[in-house]
């Protein structure tokens, strides 16, 4: 006889079995196999929290297409300002890392446990101090490969602006004179020109000296009033670092980790990734501590270099104003090709970004982490950071017009108050007016306190220099 109870049991069993199969199917397929992912795992990507000291990471944009071709538009002039690629620590940071390494090595710990358990078989990641300051050459995040690969990417993008069949023409590439910057420029140029590199590229190294004045990519060196130490690490509370030290001393006893060691561990993670492509130190810090150390870097960048520094905008305007002059010249470019590729340091890039008004945010607080801000140094000036400024010639309503498009770290970056053009670009005339208005008080000689008898150049002219 039919039993309602038995039927219910069967129904429940079938439902359970169906649920198990569904879970197994989801496990096999994985959430990332869905047509459109529903997770935001990239927020946990450690490369987004290294304060500009780790490998390149693209900017989190707005989903705007960055293709070289926009309907009814062509790129007819382009500027690149790029930071050198991934590098070894500086000499000073290297000493700081060595000190932590020696401290951990000397600790009276027979068998390490917890997050620092790997240290039992760990060797310092820089085999020779001569590597300090240099570009990295191998691993997943090789700085030289970053430069070469980006050169190949831009060649595809700007191929229509290069005619390699014309004899005697050269592509000029400018770089700060520090070795890693020049190396970046050379490897980029090799990627861009391939086998024609030696014949068709001239890499111009601009001295990073006061005597170079404003005719350089490091104008800050010639600004006597510039103070790059407005913010100091001790200006922000270290309660998070103290909690993290307590956590590590509980989980990995015997190493006597202090609050001062926490930012150094973060440095270890970033630079070892640059060199080896992996780092066990990246798994040592808690998420809270990692966000804390990243914010310390943000504060340093903001107050010592960017918007929070009274001279950041003035110094950055030297380069921004020179590119403005080239963008306005729609008759004929002064060089063989309408391409202006420049290479420098993170500091110099951020000062240019400031003069362009890319990150006009309220001052970062010095008592708590500001999460709701667009000023994230990791996304703004990672190793290999790059700013593209493209002039577009577009046909709009039957008339040819010029526009300017800004691309920061591979993401189209619409200007907050000027994005009415194709692809959210800015009309050229409006771009110029906006830049001049933002920098009406950016008088370098006056603001920087340049002596009246200064013998160094007071304008950037290398884009036009040495023209036959």
Swiss-Prot record:
Positions in coiled-coil regions: none
Glycosylation sites: 163, 196, 256, 321, 360, 453
Highest taxon of the lineage: Eukaryota
Keywords carried by this UniProt record: Glycoprotein, Hydrolase, Signal, Stress response
Single GO MF descriptor: acid phosphatase activity
InterPro entries: Acid_Pase_AS, His_Pase_clade-2, His_PPase_superfam, Histidine_acid_Pase_euk
Catalytic activity annotation: a phosphate monoester + H2O = an alcohol + phosphate
Signal peptide: 1-22
SUPFAM superfamilies for the chain: Phosphoglycerate mutase-like
Family: Belongs to the histidine acid phosphatase family.
Name of this chain's protein: Acid phosphatase PHO1
Annotated organism of origin: Komagataella pastoris
